[in-house]
Amino acid sequence: MSGELWITLVDTADIVGVTLTFCVNIVLLGLLKTRGKNLGTYKYLMAFFSVFSIFYAIIEFILRPIMHIENTTFFLISRKRFNYSTKLGKINSAFYCACFATSFVVSGVHFVYRYFATCKPNLLRLFNLPTLLLWPLGCSVPVTMWASVSYFLYPDTEYTEAAVTNVLNNHYNWIKKENVSYIAYVYYQYENGVRHIYLKNLLGCFVHYFVMSMTFVVMFYCGYATWKTMNEHKDVSDRTRALQKQLFKALVLQTLIPTIFMYAPTGVMFIAPFFDVNLNANANFIVFCSFLYPGLDPLILILIIRDFRRTIFNFLCGKKNSVDESRSTTRANLSQVPT
């Protein structure tokens, strides 16, 4: 499809995504406050992810990213809403990359918590204060790695300046060069028929893949171990087992959503230039997916956790008594969850 059509789709997804993200996450935060009293420290993880999702959606709305793959180069281009320096634009793009990486890392932490709750309950103390505060510090390491390589290993050069100008002129001719900032992932170039590989850029991509792979391995291992343990142990109450299964189903779906909307598109984003696959403006399907992701992910929790779902349904139907009953049921159920 043409660049103009893709920009229309991306901008529409931006509006839909930020609206959905705000509505769903505010509802989830309200449910956590009124129905999550006895959910333990897990409610803090869900609350953090909700707040982060809102923040991520705001960043995307401000930066208005577009993506383009052409001539062994992947371009992350941000359309400026107001004028600022090239250096600040580079920092903004790297910060967007940090938010992108955070979504992977936090998903992994969710699975670690459920793994501890089901398989290693004695380790749940690591999610209590004050050690709970160490988790953001640990998560910041891979996030900082991702953002740092995006900023330092992909400098603007004469080639990238000419390349991004050519991309804008050929595919997005209504966007002026001075109104964008960008990061160009150049894998290699051909000069006089000889291929010159950019080792720094390939190293940066390796770091990105390492972070993605590690978070995916953590989710897969913890998810499998949790499922196996739940099926082996029959000595827990029906209420506890039911709630554990609801939370596990939510996490499984919360793995599928980022896999479809984040992992798979990002994998294509980094692999296509290496094999000289010119997706051109079609690479914007990655942005399209990323705009919708922050609103879809927390929606899973609301739909899967029965008491959350019933509370919303009863509220919409005006059944106050049922809502109060749901609150009591929620407290009874969640009191069974390890904290």
Swiss-Prot record:
GO CC, one annotated term: periciliary membrane compartment
Main location: membrane
Transmembrane region(s): 12-32, 43-63, 93-113, 132-152, 202-222, 255-275, 285-305
Induction: Induced upon exposure to the volatile odorant diacetyl.
Extracellular side: 1-11, 64-92, 153-201, 276-284
Glycosylation site list: 71, 83, 179
Sequence ranges on the Cytoplasmic membrane side: 33-42, 114-131, 223-254, 306-339
Top-level taxon of the source organism: Eukaryota
Compartments (UniProt record): Cell projection, Cilium membrane
Keyword Cell membrane: yes
Keywords: Cell membrane, Cell projection, Chemotaxis, Cilium, Glycoprotein, Membrane, Olfaction, Receptor, Sensory transduction, Transmembrane, Transmembrane helix
Keyword Membrane carried by entry: yes
GO molecular function: G protein-coupled olfactory receptor activity; G protein-coupled receptor activity; G-protein alpha-subunit binding
Membrane-related topology note: Multi-pass membrane protein
Disruption phenotype: Defective response to diacetyl with wild-type response exhibited to other ketones and odorants sensed by AWA.
Any Pfam family matching the protein: 7TM_GPCR_Str
Entry comment describing in which tissues the protein is expressed: Strongly expressed in the sensory cilia of AWA olfactory neurons, and at low levels in the CEP neurons.
GO biological process, one term: positive chemotaxis
Family of this protein: Belongs to the nematode receptor-like protein str family.
Subunit structure: Interacts with odr-4.
Function: An odorant receptor which affects chemotaxis to the volatile odorant diacetyl. Specifies AWA neuronal cell fate via the odr-7 pathway.
This protein's name: Serpentine receptor class r-10
